Amino acid sequence: MAGERERGGRERSRDREERDSEFVDKLVHINRVAKVVKGGKRFGFAALVVIGDQKGRVGFGHGKAREVPEAIRKATESAKRNLTRVPLREGRTLHHDIAGRHGAGRVYLRAAPAGTGIIAGGPMRAVFETLGIQDVVAKSVGSSNPYNMVRATFDALKHQDSPRSVSARRNIKVSTLQSRRVGGDAEAVAE
């Protein structure tokens, strides 16, 4: 019965909810906006939402509407359409240190040992929690605008490479990369 469609090609709402339940969403920011019209001001709301499966897929979306719940719904739908996959080391942290920027906002992300936790501020924390990262140290420099911070974080995560993709690009074995990582700089210079 699961996955059946009713007349008209619509899925049953229960099945749709089961499919959507794999995602965790976090509301990052709500902004009240005003449009000046002839009769006065018309108020609306803008929402920024981050959504992820806590297994390496994450996306963010922006939605605007006259009511808060509608703006959040639109932002969530937008985030689902913009999911990206990020490779994680041991399913808990980043493979290497990275930096990202958007506008005047810069973020620096560092891989951390097990047990460190998420050391990051506001919007970046929401991205890491929905992504499934458990150990990371992050620093934001410059603009503290939530939109810029989220976009800068996604810019940094876009440049995240797994050892497998690096080894394929450089035509070397993954074990060679791993030995250089564990051994440190002294052994890498000796080779």
UniProtKB/Swiss-Prot annotation:
InterPro entries: Ribosomal_Su5_D2-typ_SF, Ribosomal_uS5, Ribosomal_uS5_bac-type, Ribosomal_uS5_C, Ribosomal_uS5_N, Ribosomal_uS5_N_CS, Ribsml_uS5_D2-typ_fold_subgr. Keywords: Ribonucleoprotein, Ribosomal protein, RNA-binding, rRNA-binding. The N-terminal domain interacts with the head of the 30S subunit; the C-terminal domain interacts with the body and contacts protein S4. The interaction surface between S4 and S5 is involved in control of translational fidelity. GO terms for cellular component: small ribosomal subunit. Coiled coil: none annotated. This is Small ribosomal subunit protein uS5. Residues 1-20 are annotated as: Disordered. The gene is rpsE.
